Amino acid sequence: MSQSKKIAVQMDPIESIDIKTDSTILMIMEAQERGYSIYHYQPKDLTLKNGTLTARARALSIHLEESNHFKIGDSEIIKLYEVDVVLMRQDPPFDMSYITATHLLEQVHPKTLVVNNPISVRNSPEKIFTTLFPDLMPPTLITRDSEAIRAFRDENKEVIIKPLYGNGGVGIHRFNKNSFNPEILKQYLGLPIMVQEYIKEITQGDRRLIIIDGDYCGSVARLPKEGEIKANFHAGGIPNKTDLVFRDKE
């Protein structure tokens, strides 16, 4: 009898996951369909001892039944070099705990396939990575200099301020010349932030394109609620099936 294939999923507490919006749930269910045994652990459960990386993990099974969508086993220590795949699926913040997890997972990759490559994850924080394509972005500033932020706001009249390493629409604010309050910067704890020109077309939603191995597979529009600027699903954004437009094809 062949040995069961194993996937270890590094993610947030399974109890806190919203099965309606979390794509990791669908990935786990697909892996189950393909015969993989699934183990769940959090970044805090990683241990590196004498060159061996382990995780305090629990066997996990998922089914789409609200309020009763998972079954989880007792904790056990698993050696990550003995599993077939590790999926890095925890949400930001992109802090030292997150970065440390990428360093530890380097110990087993590529003998164990870590998706995505922990080196690439660490070196490509998503908001900074996008600045490699300035022609595809609205005017953008990354800084913690309040005077630079004020000058940028004056240039663009209305701006969006967001934490550089956050997620889910948390900490996003919209300002114009009359509403800007430099005191709001204190909530970012002195860290650099991203400031962008406000694009009024956001009320029509943004689009997420799904690319697999370089091929376009589909897209979804995220629509903000009426009167809101945040289209993030975690912030109440509404999904809507869509397709490519000319700008996307460029």
List each language-model region with its residue ranges.
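Active-site glycine-rich loop that binds ribose-phosphate moieties when present
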Residues: 123-125, 135-151, 176-183
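Flexible loop residues that form catalytic
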Residues: 12, 91, 164
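Redox-cofactor binding/interface segments in oxidoreductases and associated redox assembly factors
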Residues: 9, 87-88, 196
